[in-house]
Swiss-Prot record:
Family: Belongs to the class-I pyridine nucleotide-disulfide oxidoreductase family.
Residues annotated as binding FAD: 34-42, 51, 114, 307, 315
Gene expressing this chain: lpdA
Enzyme class label: oxidoreductase
Name recorded for this polypeptide: Dihydrolipoyl dehydrogenase
CC cofactor: FAD
């Protein structure tokens, strides 16, 4: 007789494992199916390992500028294999902790590939194939790097890399090409440039970081090029050839050769061969599974979360969707709210944004005021030697409600949370500038930007005469 569960989650990434934990804590008998490692792409092949390498690169950058702080270092070397080993240790430690959390919540884990065979049955293809019954199912199958047309990622072409393979390089490339100037492409460009690689980024459009915010795109393009990263915008790659000891690219008809090529042109959704048709779940031509605000698909007892919903390809969005789905299965009436989703780019410097951009506000006909306050007027940033950059607040012109924000500069990834909370709770500018911010801190930049919006800045001249 097949084992029965209240909730079965297919995929143990940041959406799936959070959904499983939430369901189990709500008293549901829960199963979690994963064919690889707990934590999914984020923990094992994405967010965490790349940030571990970026942490090492940040120390390299600090050493190079140590003389500005009165510290003179006579020569240093980069042990890249040791950096990679540290990255692996970080991932393994977090994964071990995650497996412990799953066990402590009494979640039954099945190792294998989950596939629907009906709306209430899941087949597990693993060492010992089995079928389990499910009252409710959450699909959290994620996505994979998209390959360059006609050039699949394989061990036969170790110099043509995806975002997974690039994390396991044995050496720092002398000369590296990155196809795609989006978030992932720019993060790796920043990483390897800092480590000493000669980096070229090839982007088909006329701007990098297409976030519907031209200010971010232009500012970061200027910073990257000033630091020495080469960009080819409006460029088309027609062929990639693995020559054994190098890779040959044809770019706009011109041939260039590199040690390694990173292909970063988006991700392919994992919605094929998971039995959607057998359960009656609708999926569009892109592989997206439509859901309502409770994360329910067209089949009432089947939910979908994460990349496959076609919303935001962000781990924290997947996690929140997982919470919403699990709580609805448990009988609550939760709905997802995408009004305040923070997005972070882990480059040097960091970039973060949330809510409406000036462009999206204009497109929606919303009258807004955009105020940008520079870090060079923030004492802590100057003391840290990181005064380049700014924080911008987008507020409604009349009501002063905060509708969006973006920040380029030190610790942007952490700073964005204050404005995320403000947007989520429909706060206004006075809620920020009337709040006492600790001094000296980087967070003061938000109070100053809010004051600037009402033309009463404390640490820069007002605009009125």
């Amino acid at each position: 007789m097949n084992e029965a569960f209240d909730c079965v989650v297919i995929g143990a990434g940041p959406g799936g494992y959070v959904a499983a934990i939430t369901a189990a804590q709500a008293g549901l008998k829960t199963a979690l199916i994963e064919e690889r490692e707990a934590g999914g792409t984020c923990l094992n092949r994405g967010c965490i390992p790349s940030k571990a390498l970026l942490a090492s690169a940040e120390i390299v950058a600090q050493i190079r500028h140590a003389d500005q702080f009165g510290i003179h270092i006579n020569g240093f070397s980069i042990d890249y294999p040791a950096m990679v080993q540290r990255k692996d240790t970080v991932v393994r430690s977090i994964r071990d902790g995650l497996n412990g959390l799953i066990r402590s919540n009494k979640i039954t884990v099945f190792s294998g590939r989950g596939s629907l065979i009906s709306s209430t049955e899941v087949k597990i293809l693993g060492e010992t194939p089995s079928v389990i019954k499910a009252q409710s199912i959450i699909l959290a199958t994620g996505s994979e790097p998209r390959a360059f047309p006609g050039v699949p990622f394989s061990q036969q072409s170790p110099r043509i890399l995806c975002s997974t393979g690039v994390l396991n390089l044995k050496e720092i490339p002398q000369k590296m090409a990155i196809i795609g100037g989006g978030v992932i492409g720019c993060e790796f460009a920043s990483l390897f440039h800092t480590l000493g690689s000669e980096v070229s980024v090839i982007e088909a459009s006329q701007q990098i970081l297409a976030l519907n915010n031209p200010d971010i795109s232009k500012t970061m393009f200027d910073k990257f090029t000033r630091h020495g990263i080469r960009f080819m915008l409006g460029a088309s790659v027609s062929s990639i050839e693995d020559m054994g000891d190098r890779v040959r690219l044809t770019i706009n008809g011109n041939i260039e050769e590199y040690d390694y090529v990173l292909v970063s042109i988006g991700r392919r959704l994992n919605t094929e061969n998971i039995g959607l048709d057998k359960a009656g779940v609708i999926c569009d031509e892109r592989g997206v599974i439509p859901t309502d605000s409770t994360m329910r698909t067209n089949v009432p007892n089947i939910y979908a979360i994460g990349d496959i919903t076609g919303k935001w390809q962000l781990a924290h969005v997947a996690s929140h969707q997982g919470i919403v789905a699990a709580r609805n299965i448990a009988g609550h009436k939760d709905e997802i709210d995408y009004s305040a989703v923070p997005s972070v780019i882990f480059t040097f410097p960091e970039v973060a944004s949330v809510g409406l951009s000036p462009t999206s506000a204009q497109q929606q006909g919303i009258p807004v005021k955009v105020t940008k306050f520079p870090f060079r007027a923030i004492g802590k940033a100057v003391a840290m030697g990181e005064s380049d950059g700014f924080a911008a607040i987008i507020s409604h012109e009349t009501s002063q409600q905060i509708l969006g924000a973006y920040v380029i500069g030190p610790h942007a990834s952490s700073l964005i949370s204050e404005i995320t909370l403000a947007i989520r709770n429909e706060l206004t500018l006075p809620c920020i500038y009337e709040t006492i911010h600790a001094h000296p801190t980087l967070a003061e930049v938000w109070a100053e930007s809010a004051l600037l919006a009402v033309d009463t800045p404390l640490h820069m001249p007002p605009t009125r005469k």
